[in-house]
Amino acid sequence: MAVMIVLLIGVITFVAWYVHQHFNYWKRRGIPHDEPKIPYGNTSELMKTVHFADIFKRTYNKLRNKTDGPFVGFYMYFKRMVVVTDIDFAKTVLIREFDKFHDRGVFHNERDDPLSANLVNIDGQKWKTLRQKLTPTFTSGKMKTMFPTILTVGDELIRVFGETASADSDSMEITNVVARFTADVIGSCAFGLDCHSLSDPKAKFVQMGTTAITERRHGKSMDLLLFGAPELAAKLRMKATVQEVEDFYMNIIRDTVDYRVKNNVKRHDFVDMLIEMKLKFDNGDKENGLTFNEIAAQAFIFFLAGFETSSTTMGFALYELACHQDIQDKLRTEINTVLKQHNGKLDYDSMREMTYLEKVIDETMRKRPVVGHLIRVATQHYQHTNPKYNIEKGTGVIVPTLAIHHDPEFYPEPEKFIPERFDEDQVQQRPACTFLPFGDGPRNCIGLRFGRMQVIVGMALLIHNFKFEFHPTKTVVPLEYRTDDFLLSSKGGIHLKVTRV
């Protein structure tokens, strides 16, 4: 018994020493940081009262002038990280020395949670190989073939908005409708399915997409492992994907693939491209092919990433245009002028002529980036010119997108909505990596062309047909964000008055 007590005391002493050493890492290094709280580190408010992006923004603003180096220290639970405070170092991490920071170090478990092992999450050579295989899928030529599909769904979007406007409704919650639009677009392009989300507000596709983003399989208590020790979580065979979501999407993808292969159906969409890779694998070409689980994971993340990010950006853009009627009028004039020059037809070429619309969308993503931070991990020791700022292998690196987008050094009066910030001459004057809605470098968003295209089409159709205004009592000013979502999204939706023009 005495031996057991001694051993127990020894274990407790060792754990206490280890925890103390771990949470004093940045203090020993002399790197500015906020005092951590065990076991949360600097994330005790995370997903409760403060959003991810706001925590990093606060750290950036509070400590950037207290460091003589390119970053400050940070603890995400037990994981030690740095928050980048120097824009040139952001370029180093994302582009210049990408070979040292090519992984994200986030949770994925290919064996037990196949949908988690997607292009966004996986690391190392597996990521590089998969990225090379998928890149041809997202060329401008391939995007052009998907344009008619987006336009068809766009017609349904106008019908739904028109019904609400014709009914002389008091106000309209727009985020739900534009989410159904992007769900139908991506459901068709990624899965080859007519999801009918716009015609049916309770459509399964939207419900499952929302569940996948907002709900957790294990609850907030397990964030400690999933975020703080993702490799350990995978070894413990944990899963992040909600079971209902996994079952729904795996069945949808399996049924779609089986039907197309058996019936030789071709739709020239994302699914066709994935099926080609699966058939290569099945025929022995493992170097260029993909397994079923691999194509399922890519179809899943393509839907998830494009569904929520694009619809949220559209909602934010409509909110800003309702707030700035002069900008909305100027944008409508451009859209109408371009359409008139193309005989009233919105096509791939006329879309590319709507340059002011692109600036409006860029300024929306600058002011309200849906993905508020980028995460990387040092895959090898990084040696800085000042040894104090060397980064050990395994250290996480946060590039705080929201903070950079609101830094007055790059964007004077950052809280103002000014599309002209994206005039060519102004863009050229800003350093690289000051605009990061899609990331940057080799690991930027592979679907950025598609995402921009569906947002531009949706916005062009809406502004051409409708006027958006604040409702005197239902529109929340200033806009509030949810704190329990990984992405930046509006709290309680966005309510606007919608009338035909």
Swiss-Prot record:
It is found in: Endoplasmic reticulum membrane; Microsome membrane. Its cofactor is heme. One of its GO terms (biological process) is aggressive behavior. Its main location: endoplasmic reticulum. CDD domains: CYP6-like. Coiled coil: none annotated. Gene3D superfamilies: Cytochrome P450. Heme binds at C445. One of its GO terms (cellular component) is endoplasmic reticulum membrane. Its EC number is 1.14.-.-. It comes from the Eukaryota. InterPro entries: Cyt_P450 (IPR001128), Cyt_P450_CS (IPR017972), Cyt_P450_E_grp-I (IPR002401), Cyt_P450_sf (IPR036396), Insect_CytP450_Detox (IPR050476). One of its GO terms (molecular function) is iron ion binding. It is an enzyme of class 1 (oxidoreductase). Keywords: Endoplasmic reticulum, Heme, Iron, Membrane, Metal-binding, Microsome, Monooxygenase, Oxidoreductase. It is a peripheral membrane protein. PANTHER family: CYTOCHROME P450, CYTOCHROME P450 6A16, ISOFORM B-RELATED. May be involved in the metabolism of insect hormones and in the breakdown of synthetic insecticides. Belongs to the cytochrome P450 family. This is Probable cytochrome P450 6a20.
